Amino acid sequence: MTDLKKAAQRAIELMDLTTLNDDDTDQKVIDLCHKAKTAAGNTAAICIYPRFIPIARKTLDEIGAEDIQIATVTNFPHGNDDIAIAVLETRAAVAYGADEVDVVFPYRALMEGNETIGFELVKACKEACGEVLLKVIIESGVLADPALIRRASELSIDAGADFIKTSTGKVPVNATLEAAEIMLTVISEKNTQVGFKPAGGVRDAAQAAEFLGVAERILGADWVSPRTFRFGASSLLNSLLHTLELADAPKPTQGY
């Protein structure tokens, strides 16, 4: 197997296959569940809006893919600074049966100089999650400033995040290697088991390999696993399957 094929295989096993569109329906989520059970193995998770969790759980059970985790989103996509609402949404997501919750950090508040709200929001949402995995989306493409990306990562980890995630996929700039470098460095400096999730903008096996390479350089060759690294993506899967000669070439897309 070539290095590119190895990267494609790994990226599938590390993927949160995502649909977070305004026109999502039960049928689209059912189709997503079937896609997540690929000829190259299952993705790590699917990521969907909370209201679709019950139908996703039913579908994954029916197709024998119970090991695929169900992730959902809260305080999404704008990263508002109302802690009470973020906590209510997170509790509801857990009640729906989410295995993982991706919550948006109040990044605009941080840009305005308020560090407290972000820390307190993440802390409260982690308490609401209990054993459910909490991934914190810092929206690195909007923060832009390396110092802000670093600070959002630090605050999220200090407040109890299980993962830090680059992006919602709803802004012009999503995952970049530069943001990955900063976020992974913070994880390394804090000597923590917190994971990393680049989301949006990873289009093919070659780009996936670049992100994996940064993670391995900073945190070691044995660090990357579904417990510590995820790709948030939708269109990436078809490209990876094509690299593995298991699907036709994907059509050009502007999607996540």
Curated annotation (Swiss-Prot):
Pfam families: DeoC
Coarse class of the protein's main subcellular location: cytoplasm
N-terminal signal peptide: none
InterPro entries: Aldolase_TIM, DeoC, DeoC/FbaB/LacD_aldolase, DeoC_typeII
An example Gene Ontology biological process: deoxyribonucleotide catabolic process
Single Gene Ontology MF annotation: deoxyribose-phosphate aldolase activity
Coiled-coil boundaries: none
Recorded family membership: Belongs to the DeoC/FbaB aldolase family. DeoC type 2 subfamily.
Reaction catalyzed: 2-deoxy-D-ribose 5-phosphate = D-glyceraldehyde 3-phosphate + acetaldehyde
EC category: lyase
Pathway listed: Carbohydrate degradation; 2-deoxy-D-ribose 1-phosphate degradation; D-glyceraldehyde 3-phosphate and acetaldehyde from 2-deoxy-alpha-D-ribose 1-phosphate: step 2/2
Catalytic residues identified in the record: D102, K165, K197
Function of the molecule: Catalyzes a reversible aldol reaction between acetaldehyde and D-glyceraldehyde 3-phosphate to generate 2-deoxy-D-ribose 5-phosphate.
SUPFAM superfamilies xref list: Aldolase (SSF51569)
Protein name per the record: Deoxyribose-phosphate aldolase
Annotated compartments: Cytoplasm
NCBIfam families: deoC
Entry keyword set: Cytoplasm, Lyase, Schiff base
Record PANTHER family: DEOXYRIBOSE-PHOSPHATE ALDOLASE
EC number: 4.1.2.4
CDD domains in alphabetical order: DeoC (cd00959)
Any single Gene Ontology cellular-component annotation: cytoplasm
Species for this entry: Shewanella baltica (strain OS185)
Entry annotated with the keyword 4Fe-4S: no
